[in-house]
């Protein structure tokens, strides 16, 4: 069999060091059973970041994926495709491939609608398919591949095992196939905490670098009231202060997934129906919008028939319907594009995109390096050979010496409140280390469109601050060590200020949304 080529070196010193380690391991294990894992680890270093969307059944995983991509790609009903791990990648053309547990991959024809939602498995049973891979031209997928997983608490042991295998939480020897996780929960259950604990297998001191928690279906927290998202934001803020979650995920964000997905795919005919509802008398609206059953089944003189109302309820949810009607009535949304923008802003999708950009996409090199290091570590443990000691030494040199991992360890220390710094210093340190996002402008608390000179000036000021802290006679040893890490970060920010691009959350918006007026 022809050996696939090793991926070429890239611009990241950390990735280059990890790539060299993987290559050396490949030479040591040449022709042995470890080679498939090492080839896979090498390829992942050059692939887009892999981010799984995980959670319990009915947490809204597929709905959130549709919102992030801005297309109705993932099936949200209980069909057979929701029982299969499905990968969504940026591609030149639309294509769906099924990868059976045995046998070669096979292309699947589009469903009756011409898309992915109703695609047929081509005679395969769901339990015969290891994964589906959907290629779709999408700017939202250009920086990260999204992986939709079955519910973690499925009554089917096999479905839960599939999700856990993809995420590397099944207790087996296989490594996670993804670099990071968006974990959806409707409320904080003990099972959510247990899952997040199992995914925390990081060589950089087991920190929460690779996990963002989302309070999904946030509109249901307030029982469909117009202020439901405000209630959800308060709940998410409370969860974010929970010491258990602080150790397991970077942040907790409220998102109304259904509302966000509908905002991204809103149609003109839906806007016209909402406008018709908004023109009805207040008394008639109050009568209809008491319960979902009344809204879909009651007779009314409003020129939106019950079947159409039921379709609107499926698309918007009760909260989304009430909010959309109010936005049209108040003149805030006078076009479909305006309503789409307003719903998207209120659904919480913007902060989630910012988090995905700042905490995942901008840290892609660190997350991918972490995944490759985990793969090498597993190989060294499973197949010890005489050269293992040398490889192990290089592995430990990278994990202990890479500044990116030093930043992660210090972020974990700050989250734990274990440093004797003032509150202001803790906030500044957390930001400079990339805790709020890895982009230079975010680290330095300056405008994202700042010039290189402005970035450099801010970096020099931060450098001087932490140099003083490192040298201050009252600083404890732990504080001095932390300040030295921050000094190194600031030095890199100063040196790189002339070449930093301004990267923001807009990069992850779907193309259709970026074109809205």
Where are these regions (language model features)?
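Short, flexible helix-adjacent loops and helix caps
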Residues: 26, 30, 73, 223, ...
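Charged, amphipathic alpha-helical linker segments immediately N-terminal to NTP-binding catalytic cores
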Residues: 1-29
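Charged, low-complexity interaction regions
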Residues: 26-32, 385, 502
